Regions:
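Hydrophobic anchor at the beta1->P-loop junction of P-loop NTPases
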Residues: 7
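ATP-binding Walker
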Residues: 13
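NTP-dependent small-molecule kinase module
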Residues: 2, 21, 78-79, 144-196
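Walker A/P-loop
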Residues: 16
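ATP-dependent small-molecule kinase phosphotransfer cores
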Residues: 35-99, 124, 130, 134-140
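A glycine- and Lys/Arg-enriched "phosphate-lid" helix/loop adjacent to the NTP-binding pocket
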Residues: 103-157
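Post-Walker A helix-loop "phosphate-sensing" segment adjacent to the P-loop in P-loop NTPases
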Residues: 24-33
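P-loop (Walker A) phosphate-binding loop of NTP-binding proteins
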Residues: 10
Length: 196
C-alpha cells in the first residue's frame, strides 16, 4: 500500500513550503502538482485558468495527477509528499488519482492568515489590482476589503470540502514553517501513521 502524504488546503496555507520540509525530514521525494502542470504545459496554473478557463485548468491538473501516479508507480516509490493546488478539492478526477497514492492531510490555517497572505501579494498597476488568484480577480475587486470578502466565501466553501476529503486535519496557527511542520508530524503521530 502506498503511504504518500498528499497536502490539501487553501491557497497560501503553506502546502509547498511544508511539503518540502516534510520530505526533507522523512528523506523522501517531494512533488508539487502546480509545478508538474507547469512542466507539462509550459504555462503556470494561473495562466491556464485565466487564458483558457477553469475547465482547461482542471483537465491540466487531472493530467498532472495521473502523470504522478504513473511516474511514482514506474519508480516503485511508496513514500513521498505531494502538495496540491488550492482548488483541487473541486477536481474529482485529480482527487481520485491522488487517493491511490496515499492519504490526504488538510492544512487548516485561520481565514485571516490566508487572506492576509493573498493581500500581501497584490500588485497595483494603474490603480488596478494584479497578481490575484483567478477566482478573486474575476469578481473585479476594487479594494483589499473586497478581496478579503470574496476570499471569505471561498474559504468557507473549500474548508468544508477539505474536511470531507482529508483523513487528517491539521490546524496550523500561522507559526513558522518549522513549527507548523512539527504540528503535522504530531497529527501523523496521533493517527498512528507509519510516518510518525
Amino acid at each position: 500500500m502506498n503511504q504518500g502524504i498528499i497536502l490539501l488546503g487553501i491557497k497560501h496555507c503553506g502546502k509547498s513550503t511544508l511539503g518540502n520540509l516534510l520530505s526533507k525530514q522523512f528523506h523522501c521525494p517531494f512533488f508539487d502538482t502546480d509545478d508538474v502542470i507547469t512542466e507539462m504545459t509550459g504555462l503556470s496554473p494561473r495562466q491556464i485558468y485565466q487564458e483558457q478557463g477553469p475547465q482547461a485548468f482542471m483537465e491540466a491538473e487531472a493530467k498532472a495527477c495521473n502523470y504522478l501516479v504513473r511516474y511514482l508507480s514506474a519508480l516503485g516509490e511508496k513514500e513521498y509528499v505531494i502538495a496540491t493546488g488550492g482548488g483541487i478539492c473541486n477536481n474529482t478526477e485529480a482527487l481520485e488519482a491522488l487517493a491511490s497514492l496515499g492519504f490526504f492531510i488538510f492544512l487548516e490555517v485561520p481565514e485571516a492568515v490566508a487572506a492576509e497572505r493573498i493581500i500581501q501579494e497584490i500588485e497595483w498597476e494603474d490603480g488596478k489590482m494584479k497578481n490575484l488568484p483567478a477566482y478573486i480577480a474575476k469578481e473585479n475587486p476594487v479594494t483589499t476589503e473586497d478581496v478579503a470578502r470574496i476570499f471569505s466565501g471561498f474559504y468557507q466553501q473549500r474548508t468544508k470540502r477539505y474536511r470531507q476529503l482529508a483523513q487528517i486535519t491539521c490546524p496550523l496557527q500561522g507559526e513558522s514553517p518549522e513549527e507548523n511542520c512539527q504540528l503535522i508530524q504530531q497529527a501523523l503521530f496521533s493517527q498512528d501513521c507509519r510516518w510518525s
